[in-house]
């Protein structure tokens, strides 16, 4: 079936993978519902958002200029099976659900990134 529009939040509640252009609203909704993302940015803030999704281990980004059905299929299957992405999403969702007062979701994402970066830097240092 092809639809001109769908109730995105209702669909996200049932989705295993979310293919998105990478707008901040869509990413935020995917984080709330712990849905792994494939971000295919087109303009504006979308490329930066896509890079952050991938850097934080919340999904993968793809280039619409080189996208084809085979690469999309492979990426969907990869993201769907990636337990690390699912664990990262669960951590972010937990932080979001516990946000209160002065500590909003944006600060929690920054905190998650700092923790991820520290862990990643430690992993890199251990292998050298």
Identify the role of each PLM range.
Residues 32, 51-52, 91, 107:
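Charged/polar positions on well-ordered alpha helices
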Residues 32-33, 54-56, 84-88:
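Short acidic (Asp/Glu) and glycine-rich catalytic loops that position anionic groups and cofactors
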Residues 3-51:
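A donor-sugar binding/catalytic signature common to diverse glycosyltransferases
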Residues 38, 55-57, 80:
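Short, hinge-like loop/turn segments at secondary-structure boundaries
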Residues 69-128:
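C-terminal amphipathic helix plus adjacent low-complexity
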Residues 13, 55, 91:
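Phosphate-coordinating loops and pocket residues in cytosolic domains that bind phosphorylated ligands
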């Amino acid at each position: 079936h092809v639809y001109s529009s769908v109730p995105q939040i209702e669909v996200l509640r049932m989705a295993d993978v979310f293919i998105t252009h990478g707008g901040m609203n869509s990413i935020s909704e995917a984080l709330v519902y712990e849905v792994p993302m494939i971000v295919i940015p087109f303009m504006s803030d979308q490329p930066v958002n896509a890079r952050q999704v991938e850097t934080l281990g919340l999904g993968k980004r793809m280039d619409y200029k080189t996208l084809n059905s085979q690469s999309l299929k492979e990426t969907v299957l990869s993201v769907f099976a990636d337990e690390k992405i699912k664990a990262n999403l669960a951590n972010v969702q937990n932080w979001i659900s516990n946000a209160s007062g002065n500590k909003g979701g944006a600060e929690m994402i920054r905190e998650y990134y700092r923790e991820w970066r520290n862990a990643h830097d430690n992993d890199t240092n251990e292998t050298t």
